Amino acid sequence: MYEIEIMPSLDKILQKLSKRDKKKLKAILKKMEEITQNPHHYKNLRHPLNDFKRVHIDKSFVLVFTVDENNKTVIFVDFDHHDNIYKKKKLFKD
């Protein structure tokens, strides 16, 4: 099993969801736990973001993460509507 690390930008999103949409937050946290069991099961994003993986939540939303094999850590990067994820590619590369 892998450890979980959450980027500060995603942490802000999760905090907002804890106040506005607890059902969606619960779905995200459950999916994070599933991902730590086998993170390589999930698909990579398309180029130029192919270092990142994604999983769909509630049909039109995507949770983006990357895997650090050296530290056995799954780093969760972002959660947003599917249409917006690729527009944020600069965020992922910094």
From Swiss-Prot:
<comment type="similarity">
    <text>Belongs to the RelE toxin family.</text>
</comment>
<dbReference type="Pfam" id="PF05016">
    <property type="entry name" value="ParE_toxin"/>
</dbReference>
<comment type="function">
    <text>Toxic component of a type II toxin-antitoxin (TA) system. Its cognate antitoxin is RelB4 (Potential).</text>
</comment>
<keyword id="KW-1277">Toxin-antitoxin system</keyword>
<dbReference type="InterPro" id="IPR035093">
    <property type="entry name" value="RelE/ParE_toxin_dom_sf"/>
</dbReference>
<protein>
    <recommendedName>
        <fullName>Putative toxin RelE4</fullName>
    </recommendedName>
</protein>
<dbReference type="InterPro" id="IPR004386">
    <property type="entry name" value="Toxin_YafQ-like"/>
</dbReference>
<dbReference type="InterPro" id="IPR007712">
    <property type="entry name" value="RelE/ParE_toxin"/>
</dbReference>
